[in-house]
């Protein structure tokens, strides 16, 4: 500190003012830099939450719901004898297939675009493969039901085909768990960063105030002390 005082004291008034201006500028730039970095970190975590993990979990939950409805409609088809009701079930099944494909495409797009989401690729592919096997047997199940062979259709649904459905559900649940962990971590990181940023900005602001005040005082003293000494001598 004494060295700084001596250096400032040896400067002319204009130089002293420039030192003060540069100090204020550097400290202000530091504060702005901290704010910018903090904003980028928070924004990154918010994007992960809003564009990756939250929508991914929503799509996975939609897939669970729609595939469950799909299987319910198949069972309804088996127990119905009214042609109109059976046609209605088939229409609903076709509609659900389309919705499942659309939702799956959205989930695929997110997973392809995010490296962390790619970690769930094996479970996702296994779930898709199991669902395709299950869906592939759907036409046969409905055809048997149409022909009045409900017992055979029911046996098919509760046998190997059901194992495919259970495999699909299991992999989907695992994937949901992994994505939920990522979502929770992103939320925690965003909250932690917000607190840290607040502390850093407050601390930096106080540091700027203290440093600029201290240097300003040193400069003021280096200007006024010689004048006071002259006045005292006179």
Model-derived features with residue positions:
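Polar/charged heptad-repeat coiled-coil helices used as signal-transmission/dimerization stalks
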Residues: 2-9, 40-58, 91-94, 98, ...
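Extracytoplasmic/periplasmic helical hairpin
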Residues: 70-93
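Extreme N-terminal signal-anchor transmembrane helix of membrane signaling/transducer proteins, especially
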Residues: 14-42, 202-218
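Solenoid-repeat scaffolds in large eukaryotic assemblies
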Residues: 152-154
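Helix-loop segments that flank and shape redox-cofactor active sites
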Residues: 51, 78-86, 109-116
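Intrinsically disordered, low-complexity terminal
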Residues: 1-16, 23
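N-terminal alpha-helical signal peptides/signal-anchor transmembrane segments
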Residues: 46-78
């Amino acid at each position: 500190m004494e060295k700084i005082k001596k250096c400032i004291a040896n400067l002319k008034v204009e130089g002293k003012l420039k030192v003060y201006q540069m100090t204020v500028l550097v400290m202000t730039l530091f504060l702005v830099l901290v704010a910018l970095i903090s904003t980028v970190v928070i924004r990154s975590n918010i994007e992960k939450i809003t564009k990756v993990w939250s929508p991914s979990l929503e799509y996975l939950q939609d897939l669970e719901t729609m595939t469950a409805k799909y299987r319910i409609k198949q069972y309804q088809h088996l127990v119905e004898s009214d042609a109109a009701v059976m046609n209605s079930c088939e229409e609903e099944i076709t509609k659900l297939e389309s919705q499942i494909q659309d939702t799956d495409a959205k989930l695929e797009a997110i997973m392809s675009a995010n490296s962390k989401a790619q970690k769930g690729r094996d479970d996702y592919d296994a779930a898709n493969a199991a669902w395709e096997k299950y869906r592939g047997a759907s036409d046969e199940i409905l055809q048997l039901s149409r022909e009045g062979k409900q017992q055979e259709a029911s046996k098919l649904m509760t046998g190997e085909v059901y194992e495919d459905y259970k495999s699909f559900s299991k992999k989907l649940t695992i994937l949901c768990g992994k994505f939920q962990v990522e979502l929770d971590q992103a939320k925690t990181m965003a909250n932690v960063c917000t607190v840290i940023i607040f502390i850093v900005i407050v601390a930096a602001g106080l540091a700027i105030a203290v440093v600029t005040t201290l240097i300003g005082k040193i400069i003021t003293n280096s200007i006024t002390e010689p004048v006071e000494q002259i006045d005292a001598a006179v």
